[in-house]
Amino acid sequence: HLSNTFGAANGFGLKITSGANGGAASGHIGFYQPDGTNDGMISGSGGTITYGAFTGNHPASLPDGVDEYAYGTVMAITGTSSDSNSPKAVIYEVAPTTAADNQAVLGVYSNDAGFQLDDKDQHNIFAIGDGHILVCNGNGDIAVGDYISSSAVTGHGQKQADNIMRSITIAKATQAVSWSDESGTTKLISCTYHTG
């Protein structure tokens, strides 16, 4: 908890100064795993703050009786409500997509968020940034840069039929798939997320 007790209008709640003057990029805040592996950094240079790497998510509840889904599962909104403690916050209810080009898609399942809202376990649904998505061979091979929309295979995306970002667009592929080179018809690939 940070609190600014300085009464002036130009007081800071938190001020971080690092590095030397002169415009060179400075790493202000670093995020690390217990083993020292770097997860990301907030840095600045010449008046621009940079967040890298990042992935934005929305917390969401799953259908009753479901504990989790596979990482990369494509999830659609099935309902919304408000948190009784934070009435401006939206609580999403989600389930895996089951039809092609579902415009109710919220993002891609990541993991259990480790907290509850209104007595429902919350799970992280990736919506912007980068990560992975489960895809199938619907609409054919996937090239780097192809948009991904939902498919008829439960919880899987497929190559979108065109290259225009639409309400059905979930992601953009950053990994190519030639299905004739694969042993199956589904795969987890890297992507950037575009559902926001």
Q: Where do the protein language model's features map onto the residues?
A:
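Extracellular receptor-binding modules and their adjoining Ser/Thr/Gly/Asp/Asn-rich linkers
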Residues: 1-196
